[in-house]
Amino acid sequence: MSVEFDQLIKSHLQTGGVYFYNTTDSVRAERTGCETFGYGYRVMNHVMVSDRAFQLDTERWRRVLSGYTIDGIKMFPAETTEGKEKFDRIVALPSALDDKTTPRGALKLESCDSLLRRTPPATLITDDNMGTEWRWPLLGRE
């Protein structure tokens, strides 16, 4: 992930297309995605970003997730308490949008606008500075 890679992804997306990726909890990676694309959300330790503002369709999300399978195994089996609780928690994410009382590590949805206001300015990740790939192992910091 870097400004240059985000720009490459943007060039392959249709206008309004959405890119979703893992930021490994790096605030610099989150800010890089939000600043490069301009619109989006942090979803736990991922960002979902676009060149256009977009709204989350919770009913569509509910329908898609209820049928979601991996290798034929239902990810949210409604017949188990655990599956139902997981499903309800994830489907409820949009209701907690930008909720300042939710701890950072919790299941959370935050708009890019909120993220950029909440976090201190940081050097964006580029192909030349490699972000945490170089800083963390060598310096122990982001």
Can you describe what each PLM-predicted range is?
Residues 16-23:
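Conserved beta-strand signature within the Rossmann-like core of class I S-adenosyl-L-methionine
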Residues 1, 24-25, 41:
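Short, glycine/acidic-rich beta->alpha junctions
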Residues 1-15:
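A short glycine-rich, Lys/Arg-flanked "PGG" loop and its adjoining helix->strand segment in the class I
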Residues 15, 36-39:
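Short hydrophobic alpha-helical module
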Residues 23-36:
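Short alpha-helix
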Residues 21, 30, 57-59:
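Extended hydrophobic-aromatic, low-complexity segments
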Residues 39-142:
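Soluble small-group transferase modules, centered on the S-adenosyl donor enzyme superfamily
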